[in-house]
């Protein structure tokens, strides 16, 4: 009998930005990463006589949500990115990051380029530390 194994400790995630620097999220308090495609890969058009046409759609962009423990090194790095993005006065100055997520056990890598912070995350102040969710837009998301 064959088994498939998923091992979160074997997932490596690196976020790189030309002005902010690089953060190995897997060594800095990564909580959870969700990669979502922005569009559909196909759609159907039905003609008047009932014939179905399959439309192949080319979408490569998506969103990435990175949840990290409040107060972690990853949270510090991502807050730094948010402060940098808020302070930009010249829109031509925007620099885009790259996120690479590698599942060494599963044997695949997700690469996201043209990564920009969508908004400054909500902050919750409670008796115990929680998680902070940072949402990024990516111009291109691919999987190898």
Which residues are covered by each model-predicted region?
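Solvent-exposed edge beta-strands and adjacent loop segments
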Residues: 2-73, 107-135, 143
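N-terminal, charged/glycine-rich beta-strand/loop interface patches
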Residues: 49-50, 79-81
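Short, conserved charged micro-motifs
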Residues: 73-79
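Short, acidic/charged, Gly/Pro-enriched secondary-structure junctions
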Residues: 80-110
């Amino acid at each position: 009998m064959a088994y498939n194994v998923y091992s979160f400790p074997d997932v490596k995630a690196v976020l790189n930005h030309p002005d902010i620097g690089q953060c190995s999220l897997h060594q800095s308090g990564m909580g959870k990463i969700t990669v979502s495609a922005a569009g559909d890969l196909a759609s159907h058009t039905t003609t008047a006589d009932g014939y179905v046409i399959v439309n192949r759609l080319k979408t490569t962009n998506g969103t990435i949500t990175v949840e990290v423990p409040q107060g972690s090194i990853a949270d510090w790095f991502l807050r730094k990115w948010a402060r940098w993005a808020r302070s930009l006065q010249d829109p031509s100055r925007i620099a885009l990051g790259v996120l690479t997520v590698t599942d060494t056990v599963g044997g695949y890598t997700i690469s996201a380029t043209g990564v920009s912070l969508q908004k400054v995350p909500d902050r919750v102040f409670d008796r115990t530390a929680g998680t902070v969710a940072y949402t990024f837009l990516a111009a291109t998301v691919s999987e190898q």
